[in-house]
Design a protein with these regions (language model features):
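Active-site-adjacent structural elements in enzyme catalytic cores
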Residues: 1-157
Length: 157
């Protein structure tokens, strides 16, 4: 299924359709503020494991990141001190991944990770999907060492 969402005008009905797919354990490809990424609901282990297989990685050991909608949601899934909070408040949303200690709210699949990558991209589509879903998305760029970056950042190619 192809659903077109536009950053300057995300259609709520289309967003709900994508979120329904995520809740059913589906995987999406969507834009962030840097590259296109695979995404899934962090509470759907089979979807997380599928993305890890696409990337030829072990889901329990690989460096997969989460996209959160705001600092409040970040604080639910990761521990941050005052310094980290101030740095994040100053730089997010933006093209950064912050490496933080995970909290007790992480899904079982991620419990053994000491550090998780947390993102809040400057991209309305990504943030709207997370808002509607109600919890973070697990994401991994579709970029591999063999890919041309332009191909992954230009949806017309």
């Amino acid at each position: 299924m192809i659903v077109k969402l536009y950053e300057n005008n995300t259609n709520p009905q289309q967003v709900r359709k994508v979120v329904e797919l995520l809740r059913d354990g589906g995987i999406i490809i969507f834009p962030t503020d840097t590259v296109y990424a695979f995404g899934c609901d962090i509470f759907k282990p089979s979807a997380v494991e599928k993305i890890a297989r696409y990337k030829e990685k072990d889901a329990r050991r690989s460096d997969l990141s989460f996209i959160c909608q705001d600092l409040s949601q970040i604080s639910e899934y990761a521990r941050m001190n005052d310094e980290a909070f101030k740095l994040m408040r100053k730089n997010l949303p933006g093209p950064f991944t912050f490496l933080l200690q995970g909290s007790h709210r992480l899904p079982k699949l991620f419990k053994n990770k000491k550090v998780v990558g947390i993102r809040m991209p400057d991209n309305n589509i990504a943030l709207e999907l997370v808002r509607e879903l109600g919890n973070p998305l697990m994401v991994s760029s579709i970029f591999t060492d063999d890919d041309t970056l332009e191909y992954l950042t230009d949806p017309e190619l």
